[in-house]
Amino acid sequence: MPNGTKIDVSAFVSDYNEDFFGNDGIEKLQTWLNKNQDLCPIVEDAIRLGAPLARPSKIVCVGLNYAKHAAESGMDVPQEPVLFFKATSAIVGPFDNIIIPKGSTKTDWEVELAIVIGKTASYVSKENAINHIAGYVLHNDVSERAFQIERSGQWVKGKSCDTFAPLGPFIATKDEISDPNKLNLWLKLNGEI
């Protein structure tokens, strides 16, 4: 809610998944809330929040998408985007603990803005891409850099460990964020920015 209050809408929807987003779920939920919001139980702050969407069919990520991060990694900004996948089993809630994998020596974290695609999409024009976006969600892109970079091969082995994709605490719909390029993102580690 705009005032920060969290409400339980499970009387309307059991999960935010591809079926929900693909069938105008956000619009239907808003219509339902207009009539039923006062009946929804309040979710207390002590309640654990899971990820704000169910496991999607895929998580596509863009690597080295910030010049500063590329420089920190000792890499050039690529001419062509570096794409990689994260396993959907990496998804956890926004405040869940991250499990450091056995043998990890260089676990790292990056705050990212994830785009939630709300419609099935293939070969979409740049001009029409915005019509497929359901919203935006914060994503902590956790990585084990030794697995990812020093052991060669695919990045997935350093990016897809269980708990390496905390999401949330909520999805902001595209009408709530007029220009995602102007957002100021930050991350806290052990209480420090």
Regions found by a protein language model. Give the residues of each.
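N-terminal non-catalytic cap/leader segment that marks the start of a structured domain
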Residues: 1-81, 175-178
